[in-house]
């Protein structure tokens, strides 16, 4: 596989937009019948991989984007990608999909991560804990942030909404600080989240 050339990558990038967000729903992820939970990633830049359904979300409609562009900018190149929360439900599937690239995976539990990713060649995987092991993000092509605390309470009193929001903001702020400290920052930053639908929405949010 040829080396990745960042200077040639974004000349005609198909998905860049400051006005829209994109919902990326891995085909293999379903909906829980009991809790009616659907996972998604909100993306405001680019999308990696060919096993996704890509939709452009607007206020009035959802329009499917042509699948011809899904992997146009990653075909035939090796990228260096930082992924946070790689041992989670979405992250684990994503890492399997991107295993041919050079992956840096930020995880809370190095032992658990090493076991889950034993099938990935060691030269393609570097496990990190904590993020401070990296002083900056020079040489990293993309960041995929999947690390927010998704262990939601049974009811809002057990963990206030502000705490849930903070769990999603802290890691993002740390990543942004290191991006700013980089002379050659990553060209792509993706940040994931999830929505929850149930009969008593107040208890889920």
UniProtKB/Swiss-Prot annotation:
Name the SUPFAM superfamilies for this protein: NAD(P)-binding Rossmann-fold domains
Pfam hit, one: Epimerase
Per the record, the coiled-coil ranges are none
Q: What family does the entry list? A: Belongs to the NAD(P)-dependent epimerase/dehydratase family.
Output the PANTHER family linked to this UniProt entry: EPIMERASE FAMILY PROTEIN SDR39U1 (PTHR11092:SF0), SUGAR NUCLEOTIDE EPIMERASE RELATED (PTHR11092)
Q: What is this protein called?
A: Protein Rcp
Q: Which organism is it from?
A: Vibrio cholerae serotype O1 (strain ATCC 39315 / El Tor Inaba N16961)
User: Lineage, please?
Assistant: Bacteria, Pseudomonadati, Pseudomonadota, Gammaproteobacteria, Vibrionales
Gene that codes for this?
rcp
């Amino acid at each position: 596989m040829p080396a990745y050339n960042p200077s040639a990558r974004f000349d005609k990038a198909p998905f860049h937009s400051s006005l829209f967000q994109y919902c990326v729903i891995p085909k293999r992820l379903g909906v829980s019948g009991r809790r009616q939970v659907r996972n998604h990633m909100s993306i405001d830049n680019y999308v990696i991989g060919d096993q996704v359904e890509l939709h452009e979300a607007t206020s009035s409609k959802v329009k499917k984007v042509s699948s011809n562009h899904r992997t146009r900018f990653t075909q035939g190149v090796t990228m260096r990608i930082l992924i946070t929360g790689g041992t989670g439900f979405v992250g684990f599937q994503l890492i399997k999909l991107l295993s041919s690239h050079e992956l840096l995976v930020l995880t809370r539990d190095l032992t658990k991560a090493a076991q889950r990713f034993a099938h990935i060649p060691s030269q393609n995987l570097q496990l990190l804990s904590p993020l401070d092991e990296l002083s900056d993000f020079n040489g990293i092509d993309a960041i995929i942030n999947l690390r927010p605390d998704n262990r939601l309470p049974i009811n809002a009193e057990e963990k206030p909404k502000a705490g849930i929001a903070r769990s999603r903001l802290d890691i993002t702020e740390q990543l942004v600080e290191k991006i700013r400290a980089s002379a050659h920052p990553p060209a792509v930053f993706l940040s994931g989240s999830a929505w929850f639908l149930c009969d008593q929405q107040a208890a889920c949010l």
